[in-house]
């Protein structure tokens, strides 16, 4: 199975190209979850501005995002983002340090923003700090994920909108593999899936989408062993939704390919079974023609 990268390769290449070339850049491109990037060079080419917009920006920034971005990007982080975007970084062309490390850091902008609530909760549990009872991140127009600290554990609940009933079925089959793995490996997160009805941990929480046919709730319980590896755990859990949908699409593609191959083989069998047409003209071994009735 594929593990998705947490950095944006296009953004990485744009930053590297800015330092290697003498050209103006003004590119807009997308990432998973409706994320939009805008990369543009200043008029005098003295700096490169990188902006990002995403649906969950407000929730993420108030739940650890602002503090994390400030600690990672320092003076590059602008107090007032570009119009129409949620976060803006400005990279000076005169930067003389390791440009590849800088490009990698900038390419992780979305990762740091989305990982912030997880890291905030992990740190709070480790330091025994008071934490909100539940944190809701509306990361898409019709989807939310929730973080619920519970003693030394964290429950992460994804409210996922599926395209149709077929996707719901495929997701159940796919998620069963996580359950099966837990039977042989003891330190993997506990996982449950429920359709329509939200888990009990969301009882009384406002805005929960209950009773919708093509919605499902995937719950992970992260244990102390996972919390002690905050960066790795944040990387894996924040890409889960995209990871799930990617493999649903792969499963559909595999089934469609298998069906096409099966149809082609059946057509070949039928073609071989066709009777030869009557009144055909054939050639003998000596080259003469004769008509067969």
Curated annotation (Swiss-Prot):
Its main location: cytoplasm. The keyword rRNA-binding does not apply. Keywords: Actin-binding, Cell projection, Cytoplasm, Cytoskeleton. The keyword Nucleus does not apply. Pfam families: P34-Arc. InterPro entries: ARPC2, ARPC2/4. It is found in: Cytoplasm, Cytoskeleton; Cell projection; Cytoplasm, Cytosol; Cytoplasm, Cell cortex. One of its GO terms (biological process) is actin filament polymerization. Coiled coil: none annotated. GO terms for molecular function: actin filament binding; structural constituent of cytoskeleton. GO terms for cellular component: Arp2/3 protein complex; cell cortex; cytosol; pseudopodium. Functions as a component of the Arp2/3 complex which is involved in regulation of actin polymerization and together with an activating nucleation-promoting factor (NPF) mediates the formation of branched actin networks. Seems to contact the pointed end of the daughter actin filament. The Arp2/3 complex is involved in organizing the actin system in cell motility and chemotaxis, in phagocytosis and macropinocytosis, at late steps of endosome processing, and in mitosis. Component of the Arp2/3 complex composed of arpB/Arp2, arpC/Arp3, arcA/p41-arc, arcB/p34-arc, arcC/p21-arc, arcD/p20-arc and arcE/p16-arc. Interacts with carmil (via the region between the LRR domain and COOH-terminal proline-rich domain); carmil is required for Arp2/3-dependent actin nucleation. Arp2/3 complex, MyoB, MyoC, and the alpha and beta subunits of capping protein all form a larger complex with carmil. Belongs to the ARPC2 family. This is Actin-related protein 2/3 complex subunit 2. It comes from Dictyostelium discoideum (Social amoeba).
């Amino acid at each position: 199975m594929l593990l998705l990268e947490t950095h944006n390769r296009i953004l990485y290449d744009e930053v590297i190209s800015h330092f290697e070339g003498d050209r103006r850049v003004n590119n807009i491109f997308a990432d998973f979850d409706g994320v939009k990037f805008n990369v543009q060079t200043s008029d005098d080419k003295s700096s490169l501005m990188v902006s990002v917009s995403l649906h969950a920006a407000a929730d993420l920034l108030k739940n650890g995002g602002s503090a994390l971005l400030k600690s990672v990007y320092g003076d590059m982080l602008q107090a007032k983002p570009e119009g129409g975007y949620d976060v803006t970084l400005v990279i000076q062309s005169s930067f003389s340090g390791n440009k590849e490390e800088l490009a990698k850091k900038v390419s992780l902008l979305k990762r740091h923003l989305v990982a912030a609530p997880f890291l905030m909760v992990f740190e709070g549990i480790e330091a025994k700090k008071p934490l909100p009872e539940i944190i809701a991140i509306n990361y898409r127009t019709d989807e939310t994920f929730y973080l619920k600290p519970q003693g030394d554990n964290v429950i992460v609940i994804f409210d996922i909108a599926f395209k149709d009933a077929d996707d719901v079925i495929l997701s159940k089959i796919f998620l069963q593999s996580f359950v099966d793995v837990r039977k042989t490996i003891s330190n993997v997160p506990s996982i449950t899936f429920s359709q329509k009805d939200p888990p009990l941990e969301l009882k009384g929480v406002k805005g929960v989408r209950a009773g919708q046919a093509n919605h499902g709730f995937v719950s992970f319980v992260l244990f102390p062993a996972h919390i002690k590896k905050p960066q790795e755990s944040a990387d894996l859990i924040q890409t889960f939704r995209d990871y799930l949908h990617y493999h649903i699409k792969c499963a559909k593609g595999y089934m469609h390919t298998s069906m096409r191959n099966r149809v082609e083989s059946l057509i070949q069998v039928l073609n071989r079974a066709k009777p030869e047409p009557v009144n055909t003209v054939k050639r003998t071994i000596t080259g003469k023609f004769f008509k067969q009735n």
